[in-house]
Swiss-Prot record:
EC number in record: 1.17.7.3
Natural source organism: Xanthomonas axonopodis pv. citri (strain 306)
Name of the featured protein: 4-hydroxy-3-methylbut-2-en-1-yl diphosphate synthase (flavodoxin)
UniProt-recorded Gene Ontology molecular function terms: 4 iron, 4 sulfur cluster binding; 4-hydroxy-3-methylbut-2-en-1-yl diphosphate synthase activity (ferredoxin); 4-hydroxy-3-methylbut-2-enyl-diphosphate synthase activity (flavodoxin); iron ion binding
Gene name per UniProt: ispG
Residues that span the membrane, as ranges: none
Keywords per UniProt: 4Fe-4S, Iron, Iron-sulfur, Isoprene biosynthesis, Metal-binding, Oxidoreductase
Entry keyword Glycoprotein: no
């Protein structure tokens, strides 16, 4: 692994570093890399052979904002199901690129099910388990031949948990000959990067254009992921897919993903992301999409829905009303965004503030496009509303929530030019 990685000089203003220049990869209707916006993707956890269940979950993920969806293709039944899943989604008006996740037997499944090979928008290949011993190069080559034949891009995704053991052993042997050996973690990171990058170069030798290759090298640790991607980004110009192998459950998974990916994104590294959350019992699979969107929006990479700022509350706030109002506002703009995206483009950039007392309320409200400062303890029972930095109106009574929502809708219609449906 390199002793030093050259990274862009941080900008002097409050912006992220310039995006790393990568090759653009066309995946169905979506373009990854080449300066295009960072793409959100997700993965189903259904049995792919369960066509109805898989269609429903893909549709749910797509409606939540996933721009590509990956499905496990691990046996003949799941491979045969893929074309039917694509057809049913199209009948619903959903044209989302589907990615086939192959391990161990992808070369056999694509050979046996050409309709699957055609229906998928991209193939994911794991160089650590595509084949073993003498079969590795042969089976990897067969997968690349299918990608060439059907004009499909591939993601060559190395994983910490399924690392090419022969490569790892080779690098461990080489490391033992160094005057100052690296620690084991550094050797394994090098093996992970080499597995992905060398496999990509092999695919190019076999005839797959560089513009059809995306790389990933996933681990579960935050610092390890940052180190791996910084190094890998310095070695190639392939588009990169970011994500922890397993982020975890609940807040731990969200925090781990945000800690790792936000650093890389701020440094201009990463062209597509997935937040690999373990859903809690009864929790929707779509949470990983929402978290991915919020991560990209809070780091200034993209805008998906108006941002709502709300204070956390303290002893100065007299009730939970401002918290309830913040929730109502957030739910309202999320529900309206699919319509606004079509009829009022730009509404996703709107900022809103729902504050609970006079200390920061008026100031935060002035910074937002629309903000409301609700009364705190000992304050007059009135709620001034600020629009684009100027006090507009003061709301009172029991209909504050309804009236504030009306002001938001009116602002959208007035500010973001309506397009004919």
């Amino acid at each position: 692994m390199h002793d030093a990685v050259t990274r862009p000089t941080p900008p002097a203003d409050a912006t992220a570093w310039p995006r790393r220049i990568t090759r653009a990869v066309k995946i169905g209707s979506v373009t990854v890399g080449g300066g295009h916006p960072v793409v959100v993707q997700s993965m189903t956890n259904t049995d792919t052979a369960d066509i109805a269940g898989s269609v429903k979950q893909v549709a749910d993920l797509w409606r939540a904002g996933s721009e590509m969806v990956r499905l496990t293709v691990n046996n003949a039944e799941s491979a045969a199901a893929i074309p039917r899943i694509v057809d049913k989604l199209r009948m619903m008006g959903i044209e989302v690129p589907l990615i086939g996740d192959f391990h161990y037997n992808g070369h056999q499944l694509l050979a046996a099910e050409p309709a699957c090979a055609e229906a998928l928008a991209k193939y994911r290949i794991n160089p650590g388990n595509v084949g073993f011993g003498k079969k590795k190069d042969l089976q990897f080559g067969q997968l690349i031949e299918f990608a060439i034949k059907y004009g499909k891009p591939v993601r060559i995704g190395a994983n910490w948990g399924s690392l090419d053991q022969s490569l790892a052993a080779q690098l461990m042997d080489e490391n033992s000959q160094r005057d100052t050996p690296w620690d084991a973690g550094r050797v394994l990171r090098e093996a992970l990067i080499r597995s992905a990058v060398d496999s990509a170069e092999r695919a190019v030798e076999l005839g797959l254009p560089r513009e059809r290759i995306i790389l990933s090298a996933k681990v579960s640790g935050v610092q390890e992921l940052i180190a791996v991607y910084r190094d890998m980004a310095s070695r190639c110009d392939f588009a990169l897919h970011l994500g922890l192998t397993e982020a975890g459950i609940g807040s731990k998974g969200i925090v781990a993903s945000a800690a790792a990916l936000s650093v890389l994104l701020q440094e201009g590294i990463g062209d597509t992301i997935r937040i690999s959350l373990t859903p809690e019992p009864g929790q929707s699979r779509t949470q990983e999409v929402v978290v991915a969107q919020e991560l990209l929006q809070t780091t200034g990479q993209r805008a998906f829905t108006p941002m709502v700022t709300a204070c956390p509350g303290c002893g100065r706030t007299t009730s939970e009303f401002f918290q309830e109002l913040a929730g109502v506002v957030q739910n309202h703009v999320r529900a309206k965004m699919p319509e606004w995206k079509i009829t009022n483009p730009g509404a996703e950039n709107m900022t809103l503030a729902v504050m609970g007392c006079v200390v920061n309320g008026p100031g935060e409200s002035r910074h937002a496009n629309i903000g409301i400062s609700l009364p705190g303890t000992g304050e007059a029972p009135s709620a001034p509303v600020f629009i684009d930095g100027e006090k507009s109106v003061t709301l009172r009574g029991e209909n504050i929530a309804y009236e504030f929502i009306e002001l938001i809708d009116q602002y959208v219609e007035r500010t973001y030019v309506r397009r004919a449906g």
